[in-house]
């Protein structure tokens, strides 16, 4: 329709969403979560991370209004998705996929 969309491949290089302009500073109502795509993780033990667990193999919508998505890798692959979730609105403000050998930050 309108042109090529920014779609992250399920296999390939990782790319982080957001930057200094969209990064939220830690504060009341904000908490950093992380989980790996390979099996259970620490986030699974956090009650507030239930939504993230449900989204673990689905596109994740960042709450910065950009409408961009980051796609998780296939089950069994090595990668980590970092999400800063606003506990008040239950929306993520940053997400970043890290693959083996790739470094990145939200």
UniProtKB/Swiss-Prot annotation:
Keywords: Cytoplasm, Nucleus, Phosphoprotein, Repressor, Transcription, Transcription regulation, Transferase. Residues 1-44 are annotated as: Disordered. It comes from the Eukaryota. GO terms for biological process: cellular response to cold; cellular response to starvation; energy homeostasis; fat cell differentiation; intracellular glucose homeostasis; negative regulation of DNA-templated transcription; protein acetylation; temperature homeostasis. This is Foxo1-corepressor. It is an enzyme of class 2 (transferase). It comes from Mus musculus. Its main location: cytoplasm.
